[in-house]
Amino acid sequence: LKARHGFFVAAALALQIGSAAAANPPGYPQRREVKEFIAEMVKRHGFTRRELNRVFGKAQFQPAIIKAMEQPAETALASWQAYRAIFINPQRVEAGVQFWNRNAQSLARAASEFGVPEEIIVGIIGVETTYGRNIGTYRVIDALATLAFDYPKRAQFFRGELENYLMLSREAKIDPLRVKGSYAGAIGIPQFMPGSYRRFAVDYDGDGLSDLATSPADAIGSIGNFLKAHGWIRGEPVGFAAEVSGEGWRKLAEAGATPANRAAELPGFGVKLAVPVPPDTRCALIELETPGQPSDFRVTLQNFFVLTRYNRSNLYAAAVMDLATELARAKPGLPAPQPNPGRENS
């Protein structure tokens, strides 16, 4: 792990904290659970109480973050086709091809080094931040403090991310009050959570920094590194369109994205693949629902499951699949992409 991270260096120069952001929130430094967290950080990682009291004294509770966590986009829309339309449209495909052309060398290198197709990496960046245009407007300390101490459903997870964020800030020698990201505390072009930033961010442009805010090359290499570390299989597809009949398929769909069944077993569940797949291929069945319309069904493989490690939503992973397919189709000079895993005209 490098002692400095370019994202935080850039943030230090670019962001200013206004007087409103410096106002004390009601009670963070005085709350028992915050005091216990500070004591643990002092004991385990050598922070001083003074510096952490300063940080938590200026961290602000953000009720809008709780609202966003309670109603994420896929839940609010309750429709695969509506969710898909946000990310797969001519404007985002055109912007993605431009991003691809600008970063062709880094993408080719990542595909060779990590085995992840270029269009998958571009697709992730397109879904996450519209190719780096929208990296978030919340202070990361506000997001993580709100979720660590005021969102009991996932407090344990976000306290771990808060711990990683404070360590990352110290390693970068930057004030943790100055960094901005998503409502969940994700950072930079690829929207890495702090724990993933510390584990998987790489310096891919050779400047000595792992800079996920301003370096597309570092973002590209870091995504490839993340996916490979989570089990991406070089040369294997993500998934295929499928048709279902009867009721046996429901058992597969309810089991989730873990590829637990052999392709040869699928006909016994009433599942028919759109393309031939080797019989021993491990796979899962995903149903993508749109009210008032027939569902889309996909037989998904290990690489789809890996995409759900990046964001644990089948809708998200399917959107990355489809955007990647459209990007590969639109990119001049590429071989024909694999068959569209969704509907023929979707």
Predicted regions, residues:
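Substrate-binding/active-site groove segments that recognize
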Residues: V140-F149, I187-V202, I223
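Secretory-pathway/luminal and periplasmic proteins that interact with or process carbohydrate-rich
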Residues: F61-A68, T129-R139, D150-A155, E171-L177, ...
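Short, functionally critical alpha-helical segments immediately adjacent to catalytic or ligand/cofactor-binding
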Residues: M41, L52-F61, V116-G132, Y165-R170, ...
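Bacterial N-terminal signal peptides
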Residues: F8-Q16
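C-terminal soluble interaction/assembly domains
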Residues: A242-S346
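Bacterial N-terminal signal peptides that target proteins for export
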Residues: L1-F8
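An acidic, Gly/Ser/Thr/Pro-rich helix-cap/linker signature
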Residues: A23-A111
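Acidic, glycine-anchored loop motifs typical of Ca2+
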Residues: Y204-L212
